Swiss-Prot record:
Cited SUPFAM superfamilies: Helical scaffold and wing domains of SecA, P-loop containing nucleoside triphosphate hydrolases, Pre-protein crosslinking domain of SecA
Listed name of the protein: Protein translocase subunit SecA 1
Encoding gene (name): secA1
Single GO biological process annotation from the record: protein transport by the Sec complex
Originating organism: Ruegeria pomeroyi (strain ATCC 700808 / DSM 15171 / DSS-3) (Silicibacter pomeroyi)
Cofactor binding: number and manner: May bind 1 zinc ion per subunit.
Compartmental location: Cell inner membrane; Cytoplasm
């Protein structure tokens, strides 16, 4: 019997069905224009772009221009790439233009889909950013789709780390710009450390199309982008604390695997206190609960987390004496990416690796808040429906499931649940042997390096040739993925999420052609391609006859979305395929979420060793467990966002203020207002309202005026005059300080003084903002404990961070006024010293930004510039004079190797 909800859907259709139905008339309009646009010459396509641009600038809506723009873009794609967009691809493009997430399955041509809304929205002249997860994809897509945009008379740019300034500026000024999420975020932070408006890369945030949107906006959401500088080295403390931790027993701490949290018990605190005192790390008589113990307690807690929550070869690997993190979602290494708050140092101490010093934050932003800067945001992915609530609540994005061009022919089987992990892996190997014997390609998905290598050993023992794709084999990634769909191929892979390369049945024909050309460079490329394509077609047919790609997963992930991504590797473009999850009661997800109950059921059923339970009910209960984990992770991300929103409001105020200062030629009025507010504060402090003259602290005011305003005026005598009140003294101070600053401007020249005011303002804002970020970090780390006193940590954080922000503004006014009052003409020697100091500071900031971005990009792709060797200047290309030197010194090229040029 049908439920009411199911019955209603049958009658009225789902919301998704209605959205699809609404686009069909628009798609019909585009198709009706196809013949007309096919008659246009190549120049005619570009002229059409000019016409559409003019109509957009004259006020015609983009929705009205959409059919013609999409028809023009489709024709350009046919001519430039030989690819004609399907109706489903046009639908995906329409949903992207409307500011939605288009869920399109693997192999449905998302890269081409992005060209349609990108072209339409670029007609306004405000630029479009197409965002990818790594540099390889950004460069590949910009080069590939750039041909379509060139045929339409539009410019395309690509952003990459270490790019020369002039090249990067030109890329941002292109109609369509391809970039990684990391590079965009770091450029935004860098822009807000610049001194001139002309140096700013990102002039506006108009429209962004985010590829693999779930990976960027959800998996990466809690990871802030940070530009940082070195702090004090405390490696001895980490080593000393690490030596204590192996002596802990199980009753000294409580481990909660569900929430990934570990805390000391009362017995643990007593044990620690005694040990810390005995080793001289805690003064005699001082308790761990005393405010003075905050730092030591923080380091001890991080040490405990390093030992109990972070596992080698699952969360990180140790390579060449360095701790390298592993991305839990993609299984990729993240060289240079470091955990914050001393946690990374605690892991380094645990592994006896070299302990790198902690860093101080110079600027930071989360992807959640960066991408919400855009006027319009959209995204593409193969798996978004399970996270639709989060996309709607945090980003205001709807999710639309776009139908596939051909029906999915893949078979998704029910999970097979075994009692033990050994039984599960044995069953996987047996099934792999059967598939391998008939030539069916097999992809074995695992959740950690350790498990992938264990499966590899089992396959080797059985004499089955195979490839392993995990963080250790990162360099061979593209080649391994390209071969995974070949006849008889067996591939073991840690999380396949976001790999960016399709597994094509019969292998990747383009890669085969390139390999054949490399082996036989004298051959005719056309003949060679034809021969390879014929061989590929034959091999593909053999794979299809064997049943297509067989995906076996060794564990359910915490997120259904990652499971769906793994399933989606099979059955692309209507190909046949098969997927099954092999599980055991010893798996993390099963163990944490109620495997005891299932174990009793299996015992009651009298299951024998090696037998599996296969039933849709098991799938349902597992999906409920996953939904619980997803819900908890969503709540955690929401909570992080609530706190980051507080800082984000302040960040926007400061960054907007910087932009205004850079854009304003004459800041003398701003500086004068600041000076007057400082004088108001001095009067209120030393001559409080509603007090008599004999209660005024005139000596204190006299000293403060000299210190803050740089003028020596007879304040004490003024105060002694008959009938003088605080307002009179305020006016006299405003006039005296104004006259003093005008005389300075006359000495320096008005233009020089205006430049000095701008530089002092910008430098002071930057230094005060850095101090403020540190205070907010400290506040954030302790405010959670207010919950024990029945006070809401978020409200406490809002209140105190606002007070800190008010303090920042007061301190900013005071410092700017004080510094400008002390400005004087420098001798030539002093000028030389100051220039050297400024150059060193600028180099340090640039080096910090470059290191941070290199770290992030290494995490995303590990791609290096082809042929680039750091020690070989002949491989550097043509660096601009103001770029950082490619040798890695951190100096500008003109001050390093460029001096020799």
């Amino acid at each position: 019997m049908l439920g009411l909800g199911t019955l209603a859907k049958k009658v009225f259709g789902t919301p998704n069905d209605r959205k699809i139905k609404a686009t069909r008339p628009v798609v019909a309009q585009i198709n009706a224009l196809e013949e007309e646009f096919a008659k246009l010459t190549d120049e005619g396509l570009k002229q059409k772009t000019d016409e559409l641009r003019k109509r957009a600038l004259d006020g015609e809506s983009l929705d009205a221009l959409l059919p013609e723009a999409f028809a023009n873009c489709r024709e350009a794609g046919k001519r430039a790439l030989g690819l004609r967009a399907f109706d489903t691809q046009l639908m995906g493009g329409i949903f992207l233009h409307q500011g939605n997430i288009s869920e399109m399955k693997t192999g449905e041509g998302k890269t081409l889909v992005a060209t349609f809304p990108a072209y339409l929205n670029a007609l306004t002249g405000k630029g479009v950013h197409v965002v990818t997860v790594n540099e390889y994809l950004a460069k590949r897509d910009s080069e590939w789709m750039g041909k379509v945009f060139a045929a339409l008379g539009m410019t395309t740019g690509v952003i990459w780390s270490g790019q020369p300034d002039a090249e990067k500026m030109a890329a941002y000024e292109s109609d369509i710009t391809y970039a990684t999420n990391n590079e965009l975020g770091f450029d935004y932070l860098r822009d807000n450390m610049k001194g001139e408006l002309s140096e700013v890369y990102q002039k506006q945030h108009n429209f962004a199309i985010v590829d693999e949107v779930d990976s960027i906006l959800i998996d990466e959401a809690r990871t802030p982008l940070i530009i940082s500088g070195p702090a004090q080295d405390r490696s001895d403390l980490y080593v000393a604390i690490d030596a204590l931790l192996p002596a802990l027993s199980d009753d000294h701490f409580e481990l909660d695997e569900k929430t990934r949290n570990v805390t000391f018990t009362d017995e643990g605190n007593e044990f620690l206190e005694a040990q810390l005192v005995a080793r001289g790390l805690l003064p005699e008589g001082q308790s761990l609960y005393d405010p003075e113990s905050t730092t030591i307690v923080h380091h001890v807690n991080q040490g405990l987390r390093a030992h109990k929550l972070f596992q080698r070869d699952k969360d990180y690997i140790v390579r060449d004496g360095e701790v390298v993190l592993i991305d839990e979602f993609t299984g990729r290494m993240m060289p240079g990416r470091r955990l914050s708050d001393g946690l990374h140092q605690a892991i380094e101490a645990k592994e006896n690796a070299q302990i790198q010093p902690e860093n101080v934050t110079l600027a930071s932003v989360t992807f959640q808040n960066y991408f919400r800067l855009y006027d319009k945001l959209s995204g593409m992915t193969g798996t978004a429906l399970t996270e639709a609530e989060e996309f709607a609540e945090i980003y205001g994005l709807g999710v639309v499931e776009v139908p596939t061009n051909r029906p999915i022919a893949r078979t998704d089987e029910d999970d097979q649940v075994y009692r033990t992990a050994a039984e599960k892996y044995g069953a996987m190997i047996d099934e792999t042997k059967k598939a391998h014997e008939k030539g069916q390609p097999v992809l074995l998905g695992t959740t950690s390096i350790e498990k992938s290598e264990m499966l590899s050993q089992m396959l080797t023992k059985e004499g089955i040739e195979h490839n392993v794709l995990n963080a250790r084999q990162h360099e061979r990634e593209a080649q391994i993925v390209a071969e995974a769909g070949r006849y008889g191929a067996v591939t073991i892979a840690t999380n396949m999420a976001g790999r960016g390369t399709d597994i094509q049945l019969g292998g990747n024909v383009e890669m085969k052609v390139l390999e054949a050309l490399a082996e036989n460079p004298e051959a005719d490329p056309v003949e060679l391609r034809a021969a390879e394509e014929a061989r590929h077609a034959e091999e593909k047919q053999k794979v299809l006859d064997a049943g297509g790609l067989y995906v076996m997963a060794s564990e359910r992930h915490e997120s259904r979305r990652i499971d769906n991504q793994l399933r989606g590797r099979s059955g692309r473009q209507g190909d046949p395929g098969r997927t099954v999850f092999y599980l055991s009661l010893e798996d993390d997800l099963m163990r944490i979420f109620g495997s005891e109950r299932l174990d009793k059921v299996l015992t009651t059923l009298g299951m024998k060793e090696g037998e599996a339970i296969i039933h849709p009910w098991v799938n349902k209960s597992l999906e409920r467990a996953q939904a619980k984990v997803e819900g908890r992770n969503f709540d955690m991300r929401k909570n992080v966002l609530k706190f980051d929103d507080v800082m984000n409001d302040q960040r926007k105020v400061i960054f907007n203020q910087r932009r205004e200062i850079m854009a304003t030629e004459d800041l003398s009025d701003v500086v004068a207002d600041m000076r007057e507010q400082v004088i108001d504060d001095l009067i209120d402090e030393y001559m409080p309202p509603k007090t008599y003259a004999d209660q005024w602290d005139t000596q204190g005011l006299y000293a403060a005026v000299i210190e803050k305003l740089g003028i020596d005026v007879p304040v004490i005598e003024w105060a002694a005059e008959e009938g003088v009140d605080d307002d009179e003294i305020r006016e006299r101070l405003i006039k005296a300080s104004g006259d003093y600053m005008e005389s300075k401007a006359a000495d320096f020249g008005a233009e020089n003084m205006r430049n000095i005011e701008k530089q002092v303002l910008l430098q002071t804002i930057d230094s005060k903002w850095r101090e403020h970020l540190l205070k907010l970090e400290h506040l954030r780390s302790v405010v959670g404990f207010r919950g024990y006193a029945q006070r809401d940590p978020l409200n406490e954080y809002k209140t105190e961070s606002f007070q800190l922000f008010e303090g920042l503004l007061d301190s900013l006014r005071e410092t700017v006024t004080q510094q400008l009052s002390r400005v004087r003409m420098l001798s030539e020697e002093e000028q030389r010293q100051m220039m050297a100091q400024m150059m060193a500071q600028q180099n340090q900031a640039e080096q910090a930004a470059v290191q941070a971005e290199a770290v992030a990009e290494a995490k995303a792709s590990g791609d290096a510039r082809p042929g680039f060797v750091e020690d070989d200047p002949s491989t550097w290309g043509n660096p601009a004079r103001n770029d950082l030197c490619p040798c890695g010194s951190g100096k500008k090229f003109k001050h390093c190797h460029g001096r020799l040029a």
